Every structure is written in C-alpha cells, then in structure tokens.
Amino acid sequence: MKLGCISSCARSGRARFTVLLLCCLAVLPTTKLLGQRLPSTVRPEHYSLTLTPDLKAAAYTGVESIDINVAEPANTIVLNSIEIEFQSVSVTAGGKKQVATVSLDKEKQQATFTFPEKIPAGKARLDINFTGILNNELRGFYLSRTGRRNYAVTQFEPTDARRAFPSFDEPAFKATYDISLVIDTGDTAVSNSPIANDTPGPGADRHTVKFLTTPKMSTYLVAFLVGDFKCTDGEQDGVAIRVCSTPDRVALTPYGVDVAKYVLHYYNNYFGIPYPLKKLDLIALPDFEAGAMENFGAITYRETDLLIDNKTASVGAKKEVALVIAHEMAHQWFGDLVTMQWWDNIWLNEGFATWMENKPVAAMRPEWNIDQDVAQNLDGTLNLDAQPTTRAIRAKADTPEEINQMFDGIAYGKASDVLLTVENYLGEETFRKGVHNYLAAHLYSNATAEDFWDAQTATSRKPVDKIMESLVAQPGVPLLTFGAPAGGKVQVSQQRFFLSPSIKPDQARKWTLPVCFRSTDNSADCRVLTPNVSALAVPSGEPFFANAGGKGYFRSSYPAGEYKAIVANIETALTPVERISLLGDVWAQVRANKSSIGNYLDLVAAVKDDSNAGVVSTALGGYQTAYVRIAATPEEKAALAAWVRSTFGPVYARLGPPSDSDSANTRELRAQLFAALGEAKDPAILDEARQIALKYIADPGSVEPTLGQTALAIAARNGDEELFNKLQKISETSANPEFQIGALRLLAEFKKPELVGRALDYAVSGKVRNQDAAIQLAIPLQTDESRDQAWKFIQSNWPKVQAQLTTNSGGILVGSTGAFCSETGRQEVQQFFSTHKVAAADQALKHSIERINGCIELRALQEPQLKNWLTTQSRISGGVASR
C-alpha cells in the first residue's frame, strides 16, 4: 500500500509542506483495542463468497462458505468480524450440519460461533449469511460517489476485510477465493481474478459476475469493485493489462498502461519469477484515502496517482504516477506472492516496494535522475529517524491500532534505505540473486524478515544478517565521526545522532553497518564497521569521502581540513548523489548545533551553479527551512531573500526560456530556481509568474507544464480574488486530476486574509472530498502569513472541522500545528487538543510538540549566527536588510 501522504512526502525532499511528512509519522487510529490473535487451531483453505450490493441503499447482502481445517475437536470457531449483521451460521463436518449461536466482541473485532456439539478434527465447511452497509469511511466495503453515480469499492489493508465479510483476517491465514458479485444491469465488476462468466439475473435488472478462483492469498489483498468503469487495454508477457477509471476520465488511462507494461516486463526479468496471474487491473477510484493498494491482480489508486494527460503533465506528475504504479506492482511479488507472517514485519513489504519502485522507472526514463530523488528521500528519512520519538523498523504490533501505526515513514522510508545500503554493499547482482532465492523459497506462503536476510547472507556469504539486525532492531541514526586519514587508515567513532543538541545519546548504542569509501577507480570500496572497530582501512586519494554512492544509512562528520578539501573539489570529486548526501549531513549538523547556518549557506553558494536539479533542490530546501524556522525578524527574512535573489538570479537567467529540446532535468531545475526566486519576492519573477499562470490556465498545452505549474503556485501565493475564482472553478470542473487537485491545493496557498478565509470555509463546506479536507486545512498553518488566521478558524469552527476528518486524516491536521515556533503556539496547541480529542492523532500531537520544541531550540541557537553571517555578507546592517 502506498499511503497518499507517504508518496507525497517521500518525494518532496525538504518540501514546503512539512504537514505531508508529519502524516508519514503517525496519523492513524488510537482507539484502545485489546490485542487478540485468532486461534491457530482452525485455518481457512477456501472462501466462496457471493455479494449483492445495492448502491442506492448503500447496503449489501452476503452468502459465504469457508472450507476450513480443524486441528483438534472444538465446539467454537472464532474469526474476525465487525459492522456485519449475521443472519445464519452453520458448520458441516463429518456429514453432520450444526447451527451456531453467534456472540460478538466489538473491541476485539471478533465473532465466536458456538455449536451444540464438538466439531471433529479434519475438514469442515462454514456457511454464513450476512448483511452489511456500504460505509462512508473509505475502508472495508464502502461507497464512492461522483456527480453522476455511485460506486462500491474496497480497501482492506491492514485489518478491514472483516468489515466486508466474516474472515480469518490475519496475513498468515492464506486461502483461495471464489468471488461472485450480483450487480445492477449496466454496472461492471472487477475483482482479483479474471471473469469466469457473466450471466443475467437474478431478476430482470441484475446480472451475476463470477470470477475465476484466486491464488492462495491473505484477506487484506482481496478486492471487489462495482460501478461504471471504463478501461484501456494492453498486453505484456502474456498478461492482460487494463487501466480503468470513471467514464469521464478514461482518456487519461493510456499512460498508465504503457508504464505498467514496461514495469511488468522489468519485474519478470528481475525476479526471475513470472507474474503469476492472467490479468492485472489498475483502477482509479474517486474516493480513496491511500495513495494506492496492491490487491492481488486488482490494484486500486487515487486518481491523482494513476490518471494523467501525457501531453500536458509535468515531469513531476509523470514521475510520481510511474513510481506509484511500480511500487504497487512490486508488491505483486513482495507482499502478495510472498507475504509477511505478521504485521511487525510490514516494513519488509513496504520498504522493499519503496526501494524497488525506483529501478524500473530509472531504467524506463534515465533522464529523470531517479537516483537523485532516492538520495533526497534518504536524507529526509535520516532527519525523521533522528527524532527522539522515532521507533525501530521492527516493532511490536498486535491490535489494529498498533498495526495501523506501523504504516509510517520508518516502514516505508527507513526500511527502503536500509535495503539500499545493503545492496550497495553486496552489489546489485548478488542482492538480486538473494531476492530471487527468498521469493522462490516462500511462494504463495508467509515469511519473516529473518528468512529474507538469511537468504541474502547465504547468497553473498557476507554478514548481512548482522547488518540487518543492527539496523532493523534498534531505532535512530548512527553518526560516524571520522578522523584524518593516516597510514592507510582512518579513525572512526559512532554514536546515535539526534537533531536536538539537548538530547544526550546513549553511548552504549552501536551499529554494524557497511561504510563505503571512494576508491581510486571511482568505485565503492566498502568496509563493515562493527561496535568493536575504531579504525577502517581507506583507499588512497583525495579528497577523503566516506559515503561513496551516497547510500549509507548514517550521518558523517569530518575534520575541518578534510571538509574544506571536499567542498573545494565538490563538483569534480563527488557525484550528484554524493553532493546531496553532503548537503544533508551539513544541514543536519546545523540542526544539531554542531555547525553554523553560515557554513551551510556557504555550501549552498558553492553548489549554486550545479546543473543537477536534485542537488539544487536539496540546497534550496535547507535555505527555505532557515528562512522559515531560523530567521526571526522581517529584516532577517528580507536579507536572506535578497541573498537568494543575488545568488540564484543569474543562474536562472543563464538557463534562458524553455525550449522543446530541454531535458527533464533542465525543466525541473528551471522550475526550482523560478520557485525560489518567487518565494524571495523577485519583482520580475512575480510579474513573469502571473503572466505564465494566466496563459497556463487558458491553455495548458501552451506552456511547459513544470514551469506552468510552478508559475501558478507563485501566482497563487501572491494572488488576488480573480485568480482564486479561476482556480476554484478548475477544482470543481476539471476532469484532469492533476489540474483538479493541483488547483484545490493552491486555494489554500493564497495569503490575503479574505482569501485565506474563503479557502478555509471551502475546506469544510462539504464540497471538498473527505480524503482532501484535512490537507486543505493544514496548508495555511505552514506559513507565517496565514498561520494565526487558520488556527483561529480551526478552533472556532471545530465541529465543522471535525466532521470533515476521516478515521486516518485527523493526525494530518493535528501534526500540521508543528509549524508553530513559539512557546505561546505550543501552549495553545497543547491546551486545545487536551480538550478536543482527535482519535487519530495521539502520536501526531507528540510529533507536533516535538517539532515546535525543535524550532524554538534551533532558532535560539542559530538565529544569532544567521545574523552574524548576513552581516558578513553585507546583507544586513543595524537591523536593516540590504537590497
């Protein structure tokens, strides 16, 4: 599953909207539920399930038979069920049928069937008749609405199959499924397997769609969808591929077909195990809280993560859609074909898919420089993991609450980065063989993390098990402090790194991890650092750099002389990915008060002419954070903005206007510089942005898309009522999700108080889908100009706000309050949410307070140094900013 917030934050670098990163931390339910695993004495083997949904009444009936294997005689059977009404339950075993009494435990989300006599050991069949509702909660079997009709769709991961049909809803209880859907004439149905037959009835206005038997799989991967879907077809390696949508958006499906075809062929070759099904459907849903979900053979998506106009889409949008498609398709092997034994190892599913998604996309579009995006994501994860409230990758998870909270930036980001580190150490081909061996040993079954790294250890004959256990079992980021190379060796010490200098690390915590040095032939020369090692052999050559490839999961600190040598040769001695790594390390040192903001800004100036968009994006991200979180006065902010204009203005000018011959990198670089200069209030850029934005609105095909969308964002942040009205109309009428959601987000970016008020009112008006409302409220909290107004609105209109929050989105809103940077702000946030509880937000509130405290501390320590640096740059004098 790709969470909507995860996919956004994972590729945002140090994006402006830190609210998206917060939702990667913890935004999920905190309802207190008792931990209760199902007994292992009864195991399902096969489900026969017939559902009859009524899309107008938002309800359905179900007829279900479950073939089970009973390990020992018992007169009770326990399975998972919630929000299901049982009509009848019976069991047939040994030729005898018994009718059950049913007792429900809502807290444990279980149903217990009690029978008059013991069921003998061996095979038996449960027969269940039940009814349910098509809920509005975006989970289980739920209703999705468009302007013209309703759809009935599913989202089961992690523990919501039990909301749709009674089931043994744990990943280890794999079974096969025969699914039939009785639906209205004119509707279509999609499920995991191809259609076996489609017959009229029962009744004149219904038809029954029966699907072929599925492979053996876990409940959370089951899917069934009903509505008016239209599809574009393709075929690859003997597999029928379809991308489906509502009828008005089917023109936006061909890009997804092309990407899916490429990715399927790539994965068949990479894994050495062919995709096991005869078809693969990718379906865009109007209402869908996750970014996407890897249902076996029937992957579901948010519309923005699948549907795209290849002619008018920006590079970023094309990249995002391709990566999300590749992520979910990776799960068809890693998660669906082979599934974790229990949710404490969900990181192996999600981390692997996050790591794997980059490979086919990088091969498909080398010009997108995916490796630089990976490096930026790694940098973001290191910052996330350097907070005191982080967790180990593998953590205890028993209740639905605990399981839900496992789907965070650690399970996706850190797990992916650890795999990247190990692959860099072993080499790509050795690592690939280990992946193949792991999958081949556990086909259609369950496995543990130990199974995975044991396969890698056996394949490589290197200590992968020790490295993985070290990085997976303990929280936090290693800080490696290097001495100067001498005699072919370098002294190195390690300790846990925290962004807050007030937190003292546990000196006993150490890691076993590979450290790769740049060798004389420009390859990675790796050594394994263990807790007992204090010196490593290093190859000769200068400058000395200890993270060759930029793929190590650690922060680095160098002696002053070594650091100066690296910076002096940064363009020639380091690759773009390594430059991103160095920028991240230096910024982290600023956050931890081990370096000054002036040192970082000097490094930014050193890479200002870098031709790689990823490097410039990383550099400007640190600057933007300094502008927002360190600069404390209007004069300091104005001085920083003037510095950016003078430093990057000439670079932007040298790029010149867009050309059809521009590479994707050049387009992204131009847009990043344009955005930075717009944020810095460059008058010429603001005028240019307004002109481009209006042209782009009138005819999207007339403007280079990446620049057009950037211009629109700049114009909105400086915009008037006329532009607001244009964007609101697009958000309500466009059939292109990229334009529709892009315009919706920009409504929350306006800064004039009357337009901020309109955007806030609109967010709670009922005209914004629930999956989007929390983000619309969170965005204005991120900037100085609109924060206080947005916070007052949220407090004053809490009943309306709360009505828009879904089960999972409350934490996004609560977490966004971490943008405050004052004692007063912290007190207000704590006080308000102490009396206005949000069920999804306990962890998000902790992270919010942590961010506020971190900002207060960062500003207190670094603001004087920023002022001194601005003075030395002649940007500020006597409290007055220089133009």
Locations of the language-model features?
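Hydrophobic helix-coil surface modules that form long, contiguous segments used
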Residues: 62, 153-159, 166-326, 355-358, ...
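Long, ordered, helix-rich scaffold segments
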Residues: 379, 386, 491-493, 501, ...
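Surface-exposed, acidic/Ser/Thr-rich flexible loop segments
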Residues: 111, 117-176, 180-187, 498-513
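A surface-exposed beta-strand-loop module
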Residues: 83-146, 203, 533-539
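Hydrophobic alpha-helical and helix-loop surface patches within well-folded domains
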Residues: 86, 96, 211, 240-503, ...
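Solvent-exposed beta-hairpin/edge-strand motifs
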Residues: 74-99, 510-512, 516-518
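N-terminal, polar/Ser/Thr-rich
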Residues: 22, 27-61, 94-96, 146-150, ...
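Ligand-binding face of N-terminal immunoglobulin V-set domains in extracellular IgSF glycoproteins
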Residues: 61-81
